[in-house]
Amino acid sequence: MSNWNIWSVPILIIALVIITPILAILYSAFLGDTSLWPHLFSTVLPRYILNTLILMFGVGSLSLVLGVSTAWVITRYNFLGKNILEWALLLPAAVPAYIIAYAYTDFFEYAGFFQGMLRDIFGWESAKDYWFPNIRSMGGAILVMSSVLYPYIYLMTRASFLTTPISFYQTSSIYGRNTFMYVAIPLARPGIMAGLALVLMETISDFGTVDYFALDTLTLGVFNVWLGMNSLSGASQISSVLFIFVIMLLTLEYLARRKQRFHEKSSGQNTMLEQEVSSAGKLICLLICLVPLILGFIIPVSILLNFVLNGFAIIDFEEIIRTTFSSIFLSLSASTFIMLISLLMIVVAN
């Protein structure tokens, strides 16, 4: 009790408020009607878990590639447009995944602009004349969600690269080792894993995208069992499986950053120096950064802007202004509240 003080009271209240909904769900899952457990295990639950794992693996892998590669290129190399791309790469995080799912489906489906253009160019008359991947599929969901979630990994990995002491990079150069593989990645592991944990938690909690793409995941299963079978206990039981996933992710993130400490004892330059590359190298760096930006922001926003222009005459501007101000007020209020609570908890913890 030596660490107990007056600030511990509000922290305890906040913790109780946060944990109460979780306890309510666990109570409903294990102390409510448990007769549905055997039915769930023998029918839908294995499929929900498998699809969730596939989605997590796909989104996590692609987000890692996009996030880490862009973070390294932006931090390490000097090329045209770097200062703009450094912040532009965060823009996809502002677009909800389900909105991009709607936009991509309208653009790439059989009746959409892209396939229509291909049929006009090559003279194809029906879907039997050619093959085109179905955007409303597991692969499509992985692409859509990765294109908006990679900024979590990009932001945290770039912060790790920037805060790694320059002496570590210099040492790798002296011994002729690959700086990226042997220094940057191992030392950025806590940041990478923290970003990956956020990406995966966003993935398993997503409802809009998986519902629109008709993917049977645990999150969609919660709503199907709750509303379709009118079983709150069954929905709570599926939610408890989601809790297991979240706890595993938090544990992995903790293990990744445990004992990861280093200190720069020398004075002088403490951050990585930008490296000049050839013209071809600059082009490659530019393409690496443009690909996720195009996939996650430029293409979907262009499609949405086209919708706006085509339906400009029927737009209800009063409704848009009202909902815009409501969204801004809600986001500012929530972010301010979360920031204050987080600062309070950090101060008390330290």
Residue ranges: model-predicted function:
Residues S2-G32, T43-F161, L187-F207, Q237-Y254, ...:
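Membrane-water interface segments at the C-terminal ends of transmembrane alpha-helices
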Residues S35-H39, E86, R119-G123, I166-I174, ...:
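Short amphipathic alpha-helical coupling elements at transmembrane boundaries
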Residues I204-N230:
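Glycine-rich helix-loop "coupling/hinge" segments at transmembrane-helix boundaries
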Residues P38-H39, S160-F161, D211-Y212, N224-V225, ...:
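Short alpha-helical segment immediately N-terminal to, or the first helix within
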Residues S172, G234-A235:
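Solenoid-repeat scaffolds in large eukaryotic assemblies
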Residues Y77, L162-A188, L215:
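Short helix-to-coil transition segments within interhelical loops
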Residues L118, P165-I166, L215-T219, M248-I284, ...:
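Feature of multi-pass inner-membrane transport and sensor proteins
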